[in-house]
Each structure stands twice: as structure tokens, then as C-alpha cells.
């Protein structure tokens, strides 16, 4: 029996990155031998065991053979005669097909070290094309390591295109697509994930609402980048700088979906694109089974981001109504989330990356003013039932009117 550290732990250690999870491959052993040594078996489809002390995963070396459609249609073979090289060959990328023995020596049968040095994401073998999930995984790795200068090898991107055009991605379940997307949204450069999907044709298959934005022009006065798809990825990049929250980043990604519905004869203007985009947000989220909390914020951002841009022109009554509409009284975090997504929208434009966004400050200040109106004072004044809410609204409007007179500049 020989045990090797494999995959991501080896890769990230070589890149000088923190190692989170460690996975091990066991060569020359059997399930019974592992059980006798005190390991606990957890793999149902193939032999994976938990170490009795560390609870890290130890898998018997195995090979995989395509036996059906999609990413689950594989038959696994695990036996003492499966070599380490056999096991590593089934991995997706060469940089993930590295192993380390107990002496610290790196085993590299597929030039993963060379690709690490050259910052290349390259598939190990043609078997890559048998698993459509790998298209998403490579896009996610491209986003995860973009800041280190990694790019996808030309031959790998070609294979990803071939897989997409062959309809392989249609076998992916919504849950797996969302899981990979959510993970990509946590990276430093989530926009790279969607750009890679577009480069290989997968964006049109998995995110048609986003793909439809490319080639749709916006007024050059407000959008020097012109193309709404490019603007969308720029705003996502900006959102990633402003917030680590997946819901803020996803909502920013979806903020302009309604522009994809504008008839070409009306271009480059997109009047009413915000409310129009709400249905597309719901459609996308339902298809991918996006969690409700993330979906709800995306809907609100699509509907209200343009309103927040015009904050100096809003009357106090409209501002209070906005807080009501986003359910800020029960979910106050939404005020900050809308401020961030709206800022990402403004700064996600060519030449505006460092622009100030005072509307965000005013929105936050107005919220603090509205919040400071005490409910207790309304009740003590003798108001009852529905009168309490009506009077509370009147006082909030008055408080914001007073604040706005002093703090928020009047529109020209």
C-alpha cells in the first residue's frame, strides 16, 4: 500500500496559496484492508474512506470508463493493480493531476508542473470531453486563478467548444450548474467565468438571458463601452471589488437583463428595462433553482437600480416607498446591497471605474434618517391600528424631507 497527496492540495501549495482540503489516493490496497486499518467507508459508487483521526478523504486508485450520458454516466474500476498514473489520468486538468509522496517528491506524469509554470489550464486527455461538468469547472478555475495570469490552453478551449456544440451541456442538472456558478461568483474575478462560457458557446446554452445582452448597444454618452454584455461583465468585476457577497454579485450580473428585450428599432435606448428585466431574473432563477434570498435581491436590483441613480430627483415620499418596496424594515441589509449594486453599475463603465457615487451615500443616509423615527412615540401619541403605520410613514417622509433639504443637492 502506498499513499499520495493529490490534486488541489498539491497544486495550491506549489502556487503558494493556502491549502484548505487535502485528498489522498491509496495505491495497491483493497476496501477490506482499509476497513481493517480503521478507515470508515463513505463512497457509495467507488471506494472512498475517511481517516480515523483526521477524517480526510482517502480514495483507492481507480479508473473511469464512460458508460452513459452526462457527467454521472461513468463506470469506476478500483483494484490493487490500478497505478497512480492511471488514477491521475482521469483528472480534468494537468495542474490537478499532480501527486506528492510521503518524502515530499512530486509525481508529475502529465506535465502539470510545466503548465503551472506557464500558467496554463490544459486537459489531461481526450477523456475530458466525456464529462460536460468540466466545461464549467475549467471556467471556474480560469476565474479563480485569473489574478495569477492563468489562461486556458487553445486545444482545451477548442475541446470545450466541441462539447458545447455536441449538446453535452444539456445533460447538466440545474443544481450542478448553480453550484459551479455560485462557486465562481466567490472568486476574485467572477466575470472571467462568464467570459469563458461565452468563448466556448456555453453561455448561450446555460445563461441565454445574459448571452442575449452581447451586441445590444446602449447610448455612448452614458456607456462608452456601448455593448451591454461587456458592460454587464464590467459591473460584475466592479461588484467583486466592492463586496464579497454572492447575492450582491449575482444581482449585479442580472441588473440589465431587460435590455435584451428591447426591440432593435428602439436601440440604443432601453426605456423601462428595469421592470422588464424582473421576469427574466425570475425565469433564470427558476431554471437554475437559485436560492430564494439571492433571487429576491436580483429582482429588486433589476427593478430599482435606475431609480437609485436619480436619487437627488426623488421626493421624500418616493424614497420611503422605495424602502417599503424592498422590505427594508425587516431586511435592512438590502439598503446596503442596493447601494453597492447601483455603484457597481455606474463604475462598471469604460472611464468611470474610479467615479464617485454619491447616490449610494445619500441612500444610506436617508435610510438612517427613516430608521431613526421612533415607532414608540407614534403609539404613545394615541394612534392605533392602521393609523400607526400611516402616521409613521408621514413622520418618516417629513424627516427625510428635512434631511434632504440640508444634505442632498437639488437637481439642476
Curated annotation (Swiss-Prot):
InterPro entries: CCA_bact, HD/PDEase_dom, HD_domain, NT_sf, PolA_pol_head_dom, PolyA_RNA-bd, tRNA_CCA-adding_enzyme. Disulfide bonds: none annotated. One of its GO terms (biological process) is RNA repair. Keywords: ATP-binding, Hydrolase, Magnesium, Metal-binding, Multifunctional enzyme, Nickel, Nucleotide-binding, Nucleotidyltransferase, RNA repair, RNA-binding, Transferase, tRNA processing. Its EC number is 2.7.7.72, 3.1.3.-, 3.1.4.-. The keyword Protease does not apply. It comes from the Bacteria. One of its GO terms (molecular function) is ATP binding. It catalyses: a tRNA precursor + 2 CTP + ATP = a tRNA with a 3' CCA end + 3 diphosphate; a tRNA with a 3' CCA end + 2 CTP + ATP = a tRNA with a 3' CCACCA end + 3 diphosphate. CTP binds at residues 8, 11, 91, 137, 140. It holds the Pfam family HD. A single active site specifically recognizes both ATP and CTP and is responsible for their addition. NCBIfam families: PRK10885.1. Comprises two domains: an N-terminal domain containing the nucleotidyltransferase activity and a C-terminal HD domain associated with both phosphodiesterase and phosphatase activities. Monomer. Can also form homodimers and oligomers. Belongs to the tRNA nucleotidyltransferase/poly(A) polymerase family. Bacterial CCA-adding enzyme type 1 subfamily. This is Multifunctional CCA protein. It comes from Escherichia coli O139:H28 (strain E24377A / ETEC).
Amino acid at each position: 500500500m502506498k499513499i499520495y497527496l493529490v490534486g488541489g492540495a498539491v497544486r495550491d501549495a506549489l502556487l503558494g496559496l493556502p491549502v484548505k482540503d487535502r485528498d489522498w489516493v491509496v495505491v495497491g490496497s483493497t476496501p477490506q484492508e482499509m476497513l481493517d486499518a480503521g478507515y470508515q467507508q463513505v463512497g457509495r459508487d467507488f471506494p472512498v474512506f475517511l481517516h480515523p483521526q483526521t477524517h480526510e478523504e482517502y480514495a483507492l486508485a481507480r479508473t473511469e470508463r464512460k458508460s452513459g450520458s452526462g457527467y454521472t454516466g461513468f463506470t469506476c474500476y478500483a483494484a490493487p493493480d490500478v497505478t497512480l498514473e492511471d488514477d491521475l489520468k482521469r483528472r480534468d486538468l494537468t495542474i490537478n493531476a499532480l501527486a506528492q509522496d510521503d518524502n515530499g517528491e512530486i509525481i508529475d506524469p502529465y506535465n502539470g508542473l510545466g503548465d503551472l509554470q506557464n500558467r496554463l489550464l490544459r486537459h489531461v486527455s481526450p477523456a475530458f470531453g466525456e464529462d460536460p461538468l468540466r466545461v464549467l469547472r475549467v471556467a471556474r478555475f480560469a476565474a479563480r486563478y485569473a489574478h495569477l495570469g492563468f489562461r486556458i490552453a487553445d486545444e482545451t478551449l477548442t475541446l470545450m467548444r466541441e462539447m458545447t456544440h455536441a449538446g453535452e451541456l444539456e445533460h447538466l442538472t440545474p443544481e450542478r450548474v448553480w453550484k459551479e456558478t455560485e462557486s465562481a461568483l466567490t472568486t476574485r474575478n467572477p466575470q472571467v467565468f462568464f467570459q469563458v462560457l461565452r468563448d466556448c458557446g456555453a453561455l448561450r446554452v446555460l445563461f441565454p438571458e445574459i448571452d442575449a445582452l452581447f451586441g445590444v448597444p446602449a447610448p455612448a454618452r452614458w456607456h462608452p463601452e456601448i455593448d451591454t454584455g461587456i458592460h454587464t461583465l464590467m459591473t460584475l468585476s466592479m461588484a467583486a471589488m466592492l463586496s464579497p457577497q454572492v447575492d450582491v454579485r449575482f444581482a449585479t450580473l442580472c441588473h440589465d437583463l431587460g435590455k435584451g428585450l428591447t426591440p432593435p428599432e428602439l436601440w440604443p435606448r432601453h426605456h423601462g428595462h428595469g421592470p422588464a428585466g424582473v421576469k427574466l431574473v425570475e425565469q433564470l432563477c427558476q431554471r437554475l433553482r437559485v436560492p430564494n434570498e439571492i433571487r429576491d435581491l436580483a429582482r429588486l436590483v433589476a427593478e430599482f437600480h435606475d431609480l437609485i441613480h436619480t436619487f437627488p430627483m426623488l421626493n421624500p415620499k418616493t424614497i420611503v416607498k422605495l424602502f417599503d418596496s424592498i422590505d427594508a424594515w425587516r431586511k435592512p441589509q438590502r439598503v446596503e446591497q442596493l447601494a453597492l449594486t447601483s455603484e457597481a453599475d455606474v463604475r462598471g463603465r469604460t472611464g468611470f471605474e474610479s467615479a464617485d457615487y454619491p447616490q449610494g451615500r445619500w441612500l444610506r443616509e436617508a435610510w438612517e434618517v427613516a430608521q431613526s423615527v421612533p415607532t414608540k412615540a407614534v403609539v404613545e401619541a394615541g394612534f392605533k391600528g392602521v393609523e400607526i403605520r400611516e402616521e409613521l410613514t408621514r413622520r418618516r417622509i417629513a424627516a427625510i424631507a428635512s434631511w434632504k433639504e440640508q444634505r442632498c443637492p437639488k437637481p439642476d
